[in-house]
């Protein structure tokens, strides 16, 4: 396949990238206006980040919640979906992040008819484009985990950091339009974490305490995220005493990405690219140390006693085994305040079948499917239900919800369940 260096004019600026024959055809409109618009967008992104060419991707993951899309975003999707000329369907498997509601529980949450209408319109447009509405931020646990060196175009930050670090796949943080563009063209600009040199460690972190619970794993991730402090930083981490479970790594990575915009970390001796420190870095890396007092300090900064309005387990969505652990804590108990457990549409049926859902809901809890709390009109939910003080075991969630008007409180899963029963944190 031939390749040529293409000049593309954008707002009087000349963009120069090498395109192969297929990409040249897309750009000239041979595949229709939808693919052409997608590639034009990708050329601008590639130019901004200094990409020389494109890399084929095998799958894409699109941020699709309507709180982020808004009316303008949904209209844009509808315009793409209504195009009859040329090819408008995705070229590689493309799935979605959590949507903005659980339709079965929308009235309980306080979602309005206007919110639900916007959600249905977005879903319709995505489906017409060939996107699979998986509605999950844990696709690496439920759909199709990427493999080592597989180039993908993923959007959710927790998905990206897990896929890059634990699976050794290659993705940048792709914004919604960019991830959809990758699905429509089957490629993404080759920059950032698609490049081997960009994946080498830039700092070394020694951990003096291996976390014992999911909220501690999140706290450690948040601390390292703060230390790293930017998207291009890649921590190489030593001191973890035993291989973490998938759910522990999920909370660890999600918090690191939330606190520091980190997209890749290496656990020396544990993650695929870092059998030894010298595989990903060198002895002269800037060094940092995290001790138990650091973890306790972050936990305490989000902890307080007193009344609780609602308990939420979300961000990331819960795995089947997290729901099992939660269900075991609910047996024979009754909640005084609402408890929400958010999972994926792939996990929810198994939770139903295995009796976890009924145990949680018999205690007064609610199991939600296909959404994520902070992406589902969290501010409006708070106003509709009078919720202010929110307890959770998710460090990512406490980092986000302060901006939505909540007073988030970090606690363990056990402490959160106790708070739901008594209505307060001791």
For the regions a protein language model found, what residue spans apply to each?
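Non-transmembrane, aqueous-exposed alpha-helical and coiled segments at domain scale
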Residues: 11-426
């Amino acid at each position: 396949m031939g390749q040529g260096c293409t000049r593309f004019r954008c707002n009087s600026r000349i963009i120069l990238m090498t395109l192969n024959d297929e990409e040249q055809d897309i750009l000239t409109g041979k595949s229709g206006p939808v693919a052409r618009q997608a590639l034009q967008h990708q050329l601008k992104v590639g130019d901004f980040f200094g990409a020389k060419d494109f890399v084929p991707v095998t799958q894409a993951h699109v941020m699709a919640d309507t709180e982020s899309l808004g009316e303008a975003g949904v209209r844009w999707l509808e315009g793409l979906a209504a195009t009859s000329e040329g090819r408008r369907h995705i070229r590689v498997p493309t799935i979605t992040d959590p949507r903005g509601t659980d339709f079965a529980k929308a009235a309980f949450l306080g979602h309005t008819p206007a919110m639900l209408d916007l959600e249905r319109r977005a879903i319709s447009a995505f489906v017409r484009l060939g996107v699979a509405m998986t509605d999950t931020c844990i696709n690496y646990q439920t759909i199709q985990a990427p493999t080592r060196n597989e180039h993908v175009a993923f959007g959710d930050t927790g998905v990206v950091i897990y896929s890059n670090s634990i699976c050794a796949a290659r993705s940048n943080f792709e914004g919604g339009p960019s991830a959809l563009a990758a699905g429509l063209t089957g490629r993404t600009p080759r920059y950032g974490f698609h490049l081997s040199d960009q994946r080498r460690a830039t700092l070394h972190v020694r951990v003096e305490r291996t976390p014992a619970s999911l909220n501690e794993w999140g706290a450690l991730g948040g601390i390292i995220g703060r230390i790293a402090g930017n998207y291009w930083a890649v921590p190489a981490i030593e001191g973890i005493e035993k291989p973490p479970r998938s759910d522990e790594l999920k909370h660890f990575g999600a918090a690191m990405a939330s606190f520091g915009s980190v997209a890749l970390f290496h656990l020396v001796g544990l993650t695929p690219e870092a059998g030894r420190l010298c595989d990903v870095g060198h002895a002269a890396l800037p060094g940092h140390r995290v001790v138990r007092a650091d973890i306790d300090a972050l936990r305490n900064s989000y902890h307080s006693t007193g009344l609780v309005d609602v308990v939420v387990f979300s961000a990331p969505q819960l795995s089947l085994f997290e729901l099992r652990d939660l269900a075991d804590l609910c047996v024979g108990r009754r909640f005084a305040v609402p408890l929400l457990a958010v999972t994926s549409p792939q996990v929810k049926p198994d939770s139903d079948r295995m009796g976890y859902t009924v145990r949680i809901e018999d205690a007064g809890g609610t199991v939600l499917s296909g959404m994520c709390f902070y992406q589902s009109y969290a501010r409006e939910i708070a106003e509709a239900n009078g919720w202010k003080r929110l307890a959770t075991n998710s460090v990512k969630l406490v980092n986000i919800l302060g901006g939505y008007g909540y007073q988030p409180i970090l606690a363990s899963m056990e402490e959160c369940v106790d708070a739901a029963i008594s209505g307060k944190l001791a």
